[in-house]
């Protein structure tokens, strides 16, 4: 207690009383003392944070640590999931590989943490909690010894002063000696403690490089852990990729075409082949195919099924529009169009060429530059569209209509521009590219093609009303035979013709027209198709498509669809004098004043215009006449002619020309009056221009009361004279030429333009629109009529009068 009291008093004297204070440490050691405290703080905080980074339980054995490790728990979960899903699935295989990898990573993590704990965390703990506190403890002990020494010195000095004034020297001297010995002993203790403290401080300074190595070891251990982990990951990653690449069930929508073909090992994209094959089974005669929008839910479901490479053909055969919509969606969602961005400018430039032959040649050149994968798929698709166009009389999808609805899905610019421009100019240019390719599919892509390449889309055993698609009817089938299955198979979303038929039976044609509904006769399309072969046979050789550079020596395959059965293989002989002597009369009776329709009111030439001349390149000579027993009772193969009557709107006037000058449009050409509307304010390349002064006669007969044209007196009485027009119509470009055939190559081309102009009156306007108007047409027989016996003449007159009376009574009832 006395020693403690003396220390306190000495400390107070040094602090307040300005007593002498002995400093036993050098300046360097004082700096080391300050640094000790800073190092202690840093080491303590670092140790605390490193300990928090450890995921395992600190201080436990390796087995116990691994059970508490999150990576180990994750690995166990993945392995259990793999066992549940099974190794036969892609997801199960992925879970198994990842589970094994995570388990190995967990073991590496355990080794890493054990080494960090041993080489870094524990040394830092010793430094912060043991070594530096020991040095600081010695420093405090030295301070106490210094206070003891100073206190002894102070007391000895006071005793020495007081002994000099005292009379009795003996007791004072003995006390002074005792204090002096105490002072010397305290000084010795201070010296020893100071030396020890100095040694510890210098040792700490010398060991600073070892303390820095702790952090170097931390980085090295981490680097080694991550290297081993990376090695594990790099080893398992190729296995994972191999499993995924071996799994062929990958999405195809929105993926590049080359990637999809490479993964699936196919030449034709799966969605394209699947949709085309299904449409061949159940959609070739579907009206408005590719144009009628399908159900959104069905379309979404079918796209998802195609992504999974699983398609229920039987389910979707009832709705061909969903299949067509899926095909359009796949083409549009491709990152690059099927006709490529690289060739976009070349396609557009080719479409801008005015001359038909050069435009076709430019399109062919661009087509040959397509990459192999794109070329194979566009060839497959165009061949299908060409086959689909053979049924255009039923499905109403001409090459022009197909180009309108599919063109923007096959080619579009890489940079998105103004939406208005995209919908007008660019769309029309693309239509001008796709349409001739469809029309001349066999010229652009010669040879036959097998649509069901993989053989995995067989005809389903339909249990629904689509069973009649097992064999698709010919376009030339009788409309009455085709109408029943067509009406039965169509989905309710587009089955409107049945409703129109019921309206027609109950309320009559006038009431339907008063409702603003355009009524079309579905039987005329088959009759139009039956004369397609005769039209194609009259194409002059001067209008043949240019031969590709590689095929100039060989005859080109015909782009025409397969000829219909009833088309004559050779032109018929000329009409008899009685049939050929029909000439136009000076005057044309008004339709409103007579129930007899003039044969020139809707036809492109006189009744003998085709029979009276031979097609260029054909040989004139006697031809074997068809036996009457082989011909239908009401038609002659040489004398079928069309006289068109239009219900609404009024067709443009076509002038009467002399016989032997007009060759009809080839079968491969589309109807210029597109069923789909062209973009607004954009001139259509196939548009019709009406004369400004053209209007319907005020007294024209209604369609319901129009007389039949079976009476031969119509042709023996007055013939038509074309009506003058204020100004001639603009002449559009000629229809695309047809490829040459072997039988036509030997003859010289004959011009069909000058005789047509010669046969016109000065007031008449001439049109070279060799087109089909989308209006009902009625076949009129000339040859058979002119050769009728009087008995047959009278019988047909009676039938005609009966029909007239029936239609008049119906019109009166309406």
Swiss-Prot record:
The record marks 291 as: Arginine finger. One of its GO terms (biological process) is signal transduction. Residues 255-445 form the Rho-GAP domain. GO terms for cellular component: dendrite; dendritic spine; glutamatergic synapse; leading edge membrane; plasma membrane; postsynapse; postsynaptic density; presynapse. GTPase-activating protein (GAP) that stimulates the GTPase activity of Rho-type GTPases. Thereby, controls Rho-type GTPases cycling between their active GTP-bound and inactive GDP-bound states. Acts as a GAP at least for CDC42 and RAC1. In neurons, is involved in dendritic spine formation and synaptic plasticity in a specific RAC1-GAP activity. Limits the initiation of exploratory dendritic filopodia. Recruited to actin-patches that seed filopodia, binds specifically to plasma membrane sections that are deformed inward by acto-myosin mediated contractile forces. The keyword tRNA-binding does not apply. Residues 727-814 are annotated as: Interaction with BST2. Residues 531-541, 567-581, 598-612, 622-637, 684-704, 741-752 have a biased composition (Low complexity). It holds the Pfam family BAR. Rho-GAP domain is required to promote GRIA1 exocytosis from recycling endosomes. Rho-GAP and BAR domains are necessary for the control of long-term potentiation in hippocampal neurons. In dendrites, BAR domain mediates the recruitment to patches where plasma membrane is deformed by acto-myosin mediated contractile forces. A motif (PDZ-binding) lies at residues 811-814. It comes from Rattus norvegicus. Residues 479-489, 790-805 have a biased composition (Basic and acidic residues). This is Rho GTPase-activating protein 44. Residues 14-249 form the BAR domain. Expressed in brain, detected at high levels in hippocampal CA1 (at protein level). GO terms for molecular function: GTPase activator activity; phospholipid binding; small GTPase binding. It is found in: Cell projection, Dendritic spine; Recycling endosome; Presynapse; Cell projection, Dendrite. The modification Phosphoserine is found at residues 493, 805. Residues 467-493, 531-768, 784-814 are annotated as: Disordered. The gene is Arhgap44. Interacts with BST2 (via cytoplasmic domain). Interacts (probably via PDZ-binding motif) with SHANK3 (via PDZ domain); the interaction takes place in dendritic spines and promotes GRIA1 exocytosis.
């Amino acid at each position: 207690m006395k020693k403690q009291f003396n220390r306190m008093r000495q400390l107070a004297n040094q602090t307040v009383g300005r007593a002498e204070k002995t400093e036993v440490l050098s300046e360097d050691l004082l700096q080391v003392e300050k640094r000790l405290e800073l190092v202690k703080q840093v080491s303590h905080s670092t140790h605390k944070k490193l300990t928090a980074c450890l995921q395992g339980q600190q201080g436990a054995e390796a087995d116990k640590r691994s059970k508490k490790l999150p990576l180990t728990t994750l690995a166990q979960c993945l392995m259990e999931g793999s066992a549940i899903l099974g190794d036969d699935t892609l997801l199960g295989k992925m879970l198994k590989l990842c589970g094994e990898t995570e388990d190995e990573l967990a073991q590496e993590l355990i080794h890493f943490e054990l080494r960090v704990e041993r080489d870094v965390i524990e040394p830092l703990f010793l430094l912060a909690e043991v070594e530096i506190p020991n040095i600081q403890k010695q420093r405090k002990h030295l301070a106490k010894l210094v206070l003891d020494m100073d206190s002894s010195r102070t007391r000895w000095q006071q005793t020495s002063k007081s002994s000099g004034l005292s009379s009795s020297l003996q007791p004072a001297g003995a006390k002074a000696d005792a204090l002096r010995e105490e002072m010397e002993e305290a000084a010795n203790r201070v010296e020893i403690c100071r030396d020890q403290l100095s040694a510890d401080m210098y040792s700490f300074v010398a060991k600073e490089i070892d303390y820095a190595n702790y952090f170097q070891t931390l980085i090295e251990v981490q680097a080694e852990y991550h290297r081993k982990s990376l090695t594990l990951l790099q080893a398992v990653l190729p296995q994972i990729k191999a499993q995924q690449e071996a799994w062929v069930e990958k999405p195809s929508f929105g993926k590049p075409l080359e990637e999809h073909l490479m993964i699936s090992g196919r030449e034709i994209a799966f969605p394209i082949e699947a949709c085309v094959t299904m449409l061949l089974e159940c959609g070739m005669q579907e009206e408005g195919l590719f144009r009628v929008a399908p159900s959104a839910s069905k379309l979404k479901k079918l796209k998802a099924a195609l992504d999974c490479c699983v398609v229920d053909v039987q389910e979707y055969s009832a709705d061909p529009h969903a299949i067509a919509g899926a095909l359009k969606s796949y083409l549009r969602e491709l990152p690059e169009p099927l006709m490529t961005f690289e060739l976009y400018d070349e396609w557009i430039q080719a479409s801008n060429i005015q001359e038909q032959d050069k435009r076709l040649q430019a399109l062919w050149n661009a087509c040959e530059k397509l990459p192999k994968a794109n070329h194979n798929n566009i060839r497959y698709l165009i061949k299908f569209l060409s086959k689909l166009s053979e049924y255009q009389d039923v499905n109403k999808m001409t090459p022009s209509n197909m180009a309108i609805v599919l063109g923007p899905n096959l080619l579009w610019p890489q940079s998105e521009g103004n939406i208005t421009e995209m919908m007008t100019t660019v769309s029309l240019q693309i239509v001008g590219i796709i349409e001739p390719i469809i029309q001349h599919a066999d010229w652009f892509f010669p040879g036959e093609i097998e649509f069901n390449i993989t053989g995995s889309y067989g005809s389903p055993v339909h249990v629904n009303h689509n069973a009649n698609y097992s064999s698709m009817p010919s376009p030339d089938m009788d409309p009455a035979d085709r109408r029943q299955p067509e009406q039965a198979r169509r989905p309710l979303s587009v089955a409107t013709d049945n409703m129109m038929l019921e309206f027609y039976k109950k309320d009559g044609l006038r009431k339907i027209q008063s409702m603003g509904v355009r009524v079309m006769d579905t039987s005329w399309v088959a009759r139009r198709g039956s004369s397609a072969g005769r039209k194609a046979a009259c194409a002059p050789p001067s209008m043949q498509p240019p031969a590709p550079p590689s095929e100039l020596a060989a005859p080109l395959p015909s782009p025409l669809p397969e000829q219909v059965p009833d088309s004559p293989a050779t032109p018929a002989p000329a009409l008899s004098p009685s049939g050929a002597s029909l000439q136009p009369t000076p005057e044309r009776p008004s339709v409103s004043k007579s129930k007899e329709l003039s044969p020139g009111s809707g036809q492109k030439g006189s009744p003998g215009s085709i029979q009276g001349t031979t097609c260029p390149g054909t040989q004139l000579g006697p031809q074997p006449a068809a036996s009457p027993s082989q011909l239908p009772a009401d038609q002659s193969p040489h004398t079928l002619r069309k006289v068109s009557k239009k219900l609404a709107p009024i067709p443009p006037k076509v002038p009467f020309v002399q016989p032997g000058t007009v060759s009809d449009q080839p079968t491969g050409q589309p109807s210029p009056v597109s069923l789909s509307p062209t973009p607004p304010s954009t001139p259509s390349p196939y548009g019709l221009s009406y004369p400004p002064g053209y209007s319907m006669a005020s007294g024209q007969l209604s369609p319901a009361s129009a007389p039949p044209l079976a009476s031969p007196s119509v042709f023996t009485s007055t013939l038509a004279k074309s009506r003058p027009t204020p100004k001639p119509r603009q002449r559009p470009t000629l229809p695309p030429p047809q490829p040459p055939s072997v039988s036509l190559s030997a003859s010289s081309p004959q011009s069909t333009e000058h005789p047509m102009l010669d046969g016109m009156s000065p007031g008449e306007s001439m049109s070279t629109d060799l087109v089909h108007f989308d209006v009902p047409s009625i076949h009129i027989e000339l040859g058979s009529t002119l050769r009728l016996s009087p008995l047959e003449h009278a019988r047909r007159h009676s039938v005609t009068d009966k029909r007239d009376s029936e239609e008049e009574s119906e019109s009166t009832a309406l």
